[in-house]
Amino acid sequence: MKSESSVTRRSFVASATGAAVFGLSACNGNETKKEDTSGSQKKADAQKLIVFAAASLTESLSEAGELFKNANQGVDISFNFDSSGTLKTQIEEGSDCDVFISAGQKQMNQLDANAKKDHDKDLDFIASDTRFDILENKVTLCVPQDNPKVVKSFDDMATKLTSGEVLLGMGNSDVPVGQYTQKILKYYKLDEEKLAKEGHISYGTNVKEVTTQVKEASVDCGVIYKTDATSAKLQMVDEATEEMCGRVVYPAAATKNAKQADLAKKFLEFLKTSDASACFEKVGFTPLSKA
């Protein structure tokens, strides 16, 4: 009986010791696993590129971004597409951003201390040595399916706006496409404020919103970029000349506060390649810089 009790006690001690060792191993394993996960997370974060780009680049730049990621394993890209004015404000307010691509020079200049015009002396967010003009777009006049008001051209639009026959969709004044539209209205000597008060103008916060207005026929015609019209399969009835609104040039640059400065430069160089250019040309952009 004593011998049996002794064996039982020895078995219990052995079992308890084994359980303790197993528990300790499990804890160590969990700690190792947590450390590994944490390390992987840090690695993932270290390879994340944040790109702020004009809304009109949504389709083409997203496609180019996929090509860049495929060629650079372990890299992730977070895109923020919106009006250039909104993006400029977000950068100014301290949002994380590695690369900025604007649909107009004005918004980029306002953030660039070395810009020759439009610069705000209190703002210095752009790494000027990385800046270049990447793309050119065109401003077009588009109409809904079947063109109910039979708007044939910018000339015709101006005539019908004057007589109050049509509702025009255009971007807000802080949006590049809206600023180009304002130049077109001035070219035709049209009073934007008067037309807006009379209910002949509908505004959009960015070019995608104006594109939607045309696509859904909530306006009779709209001024948007050629690339957005192409992507949305809208009918373009006219294209603005340089005399009417100037050239539509997109500048690109890395920011001074970029957390991924080297990766930002690498991405900007990639955008000059033939593979990236093909993505832009597909929707109507004209690449201005090629590697």
Mark where each language-model region is.
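Short beta-strand-centered segments that line the small-molecule binding cleft or hinge
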Residues: 88, 94-122, 128-132
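Short, well-ordered coil loops that connect the C-terminus of an alpha-helix to the N-terminus
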Residues: 74-75, 97
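Residue-level marker of structural boundaries
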Residues: 10, 21-22, 117, 190, ...
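Exported/periplasmic ABC-transporter solute-binding proteins
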Residues: 2-4, 29-70, 76, 85, ...
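N-terminal secretory signal peptides
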Residues: 1-7, 14-25
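Positively charged, low-complexity intrinsically disordered regions
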Residues: 10-11, 42
